[in-house]
Amino acid sequence: MNRAAIRIIGIDPGLRNMGWGVIEASGSRLSFIACGSVHSQAGSSLAERLCALHEGLLGVIADLSPMEAAVEETFVNCDPQSALKLGQARGVALVAPALAGLPVAEYAANLIKKTVVGNGHAEKAQIAMMVKFLLPMSEAKSADAADALAVAITHAQLRASRALLKSVSSMSVQTR
């Protein structure tokens, strides 16, 4: 199995604050690289806010050179206007890494919680605590950044599982 390090950016979409976290995965070993949030101004037009998020994410991607991206699927609340705006911010979270040539994976919030904490209904504080445990050098200063690191951790762990399953299935095909 290939143990080459892969750099992953996790993204937690949001219109005000879009969290991002970059880790490196080598086999089952995870290393913290950086994390933070890209912000948009609340008084600006929607187009200006989306543009600010897009430019901010592209800057992070250019600076930190991730090889793959993972984005949290958004929870749709009961306010359709808010859901639509969040969906547009999520579009930025998907398009920015894709434009940079990165493969982009998507994960449901409960799968991220289940993978990182072991409970699909974990609270934000539990997620932040487990992120700190799994990445001791991490300094997530916001819940958005901690959530983004959790997205990256989930991608690293599920990516490794998929690679193992693929190698096992190709071995069984070769032995037939």
Curated annotation (Swiss-Prot):
GO terms for molecular function: crossover junction DNA endonuclease activity; DNA binding; magnesium ion binding. Binds 2 Mg(2+) ion per subunit. One of its GO terms (cellular component) is Holliday junction resolvase complex. It catalyses: Endonucleolytic cleavage at a junction such as a reciprocal single-stranded crossover between two homologous DNA duplexes (Holliday junction). One of its GO terms (biological process) is DNA repair. It comes from the Bacteria. Its cofactor is Mg(2+). Mg(2+) 1 binds at residues 12, 144. It holds the Pfam family RuvC. Keywords: Cytoplasm, DNA damage, DNA recombination, DNA repair, DNA-binding, Endonuclease, Hydrolase, Magnesium, Metal-binding, Nuclease. Its EC number is 3.1.21.10. The active site is at residues 12, 72, 144. Mg(2+) 2 binds at residue 72. It is found in: Cytoplasm. Belongs to the RuvC family. The RuvA-RuvB-RuvC complex processes Holliday junction (HJ) DNA during genetic recombination and DNA repair. Endonuclease that resolves HJ intermediates. Cleaves cruciform DNA by making single-stranded nicks across the HJ at symmetrical positions within the homologous arms, yielding a 5'-phosphate and a 3'-hydroxyl group; requires a central core of homology in the junction. The consensus cleavage sequence is 5'-(A/T)TT(C/G)-3'. Cleavage occurs on the 3'-side of the TT dinucleotide at the point of strand exchange. NCBIfam families: ruvC. Homodimer which binds Holliday junction (HJ) DNA. The HJ becomes 2-fold symmetrical on binding to RuvC with unstacked arms; it has a different conformation from HJ DNA in complex with RuvA. In the full resolvosome a probable DNA-RuvA(4)-RuvB(12)-RuvC(2) complex forms which resolves the HJ. PANTHER family: CROSSOVER JUNCTION ENDODEOXYRIBONUCLEASE RUVC (PTHR30194:SF3). This is Crossover junction endodeoxyribonuclease RuvC. It comes from Methylocella silvestris (strain DSM 15510 / CIP 108128 / LMG 27833 / NCIMB 13906 / BL2). The lineage of its organism: Bacteria, Pseudomonadati, Pseudomonadota, Alphaproteobacteria, Hyphomicrobiales. The gene is ruvC.
